[in-house]
Every structure is written in C-alpha cells, then in structure tokens.
C-alpha cells in the first residue's frame, strides 16, 4: 500500500511558498496559462506536489527547470525557500547563455542621446507611415 506523505501541498501553493510567484493567484494563472509544466506535462493548480518531481517554469524570457527537494505550504524567507528546490545544471547554463545574448543584443541597438524635438519627431512619423502630403 502506498504511504501518504506527511504534507500534501497543491502546486500553486508550493510555487508561492518557494517564492517563484508573489501571490497564489499569480501562480495559479501561470499554471493555467501553460507556463508551468509538472514532470513534462501541463498541469492544474490543484496538482499535489511530490518529492523529486521536475518542474519547468517560464518567467518572461527565462525558462528554468527545477527539481522539488522539500515540500511545505508556508512561505518562508528567500534563503529557506531556495532549499525547497534545486535548479538543474543545464537550466542554469541555458539561462546564463540567454542573459548574455540579451545583453549583447542590447549593445547593438542604437540609443539616442536625447528625445527627438518637434521637427525630428514629425520626420520620424513621415518616415514610418509614409509621406501623406
């Protein structure tokens, strides 16, 4: 017979306790929106979290893969919350590469020294939308 864990915690509550999201409502929204995968599959917020489960989280441009190491439903300080999971080495490496690529991409984009004045702004609009005169 299967032994029940001491604490059963919903996925949305665990993500909130592990400090991936500020509110449970936001965690629930991300799960329902397909941004969180539990063991490689889409899940529901009410899914019970198990030890050593693999979670894939998409947050903005970042995607991280974590393994559940501990289960709690209480939100603790960030230093303690980091002990609830372990990010995989591939995930860390991939996030660092993506951050570097974003940083390098930002360097190639032109940033003007000042805002365009009235004449320059009109010239930009004419260029973007074509000369309507």
From Swiss-Prot:
Keywords: DNA-binding, RNA-binding, Stress response
Signal peptide positions (record): none
Domain S4 RNA-binding: residue ranges: 9-71
Entry-linked SUPFAM superfamilies: Alpha-L RNA-binding motif
GO cellular component: cytosol
Any one biological process term the GO annotation gives: response to heat
Region listing for Disordered, in residue ranges: 105-133
InterPro entries on file: HSP15, S4_RNA-bd, S4_RNA-bd_sf
Quaternary structure, from the entry: Monomer.
Function: Involved in the recycling of free 50S ribosomal subunits that still carry a nascent chain. Binds RNA more specifically than DNA. Binds with very high affinity to the free 50S ribosomal subunit. Does not bind it when it is part of the 70S ribosome.
Protein name according to UniProt: Heat shock protein 15
Species of the source: Escherichia coli (strain K12)
